[in-house]
Amino acid sequence: MAKQSMKARDVKRVKLAEKFYAKRVELKKIISDVNASDEDRWDAVLKLQTLPRDSSPSRQRNRCRQTGRPHGVLRKFGLSRIKVREAAMRGEIPGLKKASW
């Protein structure tokens, strides 16, 4: 079980990423534009650096919805591999069954 503070930190990062998404995209567009002047591009780089670190989507971590486990999370279910297996064995995930060959 993950600490509550770690779960809360990830929730905070998601909210910050949503808040600054438009501004971040706009600045990155200016930076990657080869027709923009070097001065404008440099200003965009500096502005991008002033944004909060946690507003970057790459700082987010996929966590299990039940336990908060950060590793072995299956995106399709939002659960860790352990919880997916437990739920599948109980028949709680429709269409998912144990492989047999």
Curated annotation (Swiss-Prot):
GO molecular function, one term: structural constituent of ribosome
InterPro entries: Ribosomal_uS14, Ribosomal_uS14_bac/plastid, Ribosomal_uS14_CS
Keywords: Ribonucleoprotein, Ribosomal protein, RNA-binding, rRNA-binding
GO terms of biological process kind: translation
Metal-binding among keywords: no
Keyword rRNA-binding: yes
A UniProt-annotated Pfam family: Ribosomal_S14
GO cellular component terms listed in the entry, alphabetical order: cytoplasm; small ribosomal subunit
Assembly with partners or alone: Part of the 30S ribosomal subunit. Contacts proteins S3 and S10.
NCBIfam families associated with the record: PRK08881.1
Similarity field: Belongs to the universal ribosomal protein uS14 family.
Function: Binds 16S rRNA, required for the assembly of 30S particles and may also be responsible for determining the conformation of the 16S rRNA at the A site.
Protein name from the UniProt record: Small ribosomal subunit protein uS14
Species assigned in the record: Haemophilus influenzae (strain ATCC 51907 / DSM 11121 / KW20 / Rd)
Source organism phylogeny: Bacteria, Pseudomonadati, Pseudomonadota, Gammaproteobacteria, Pasteurellales
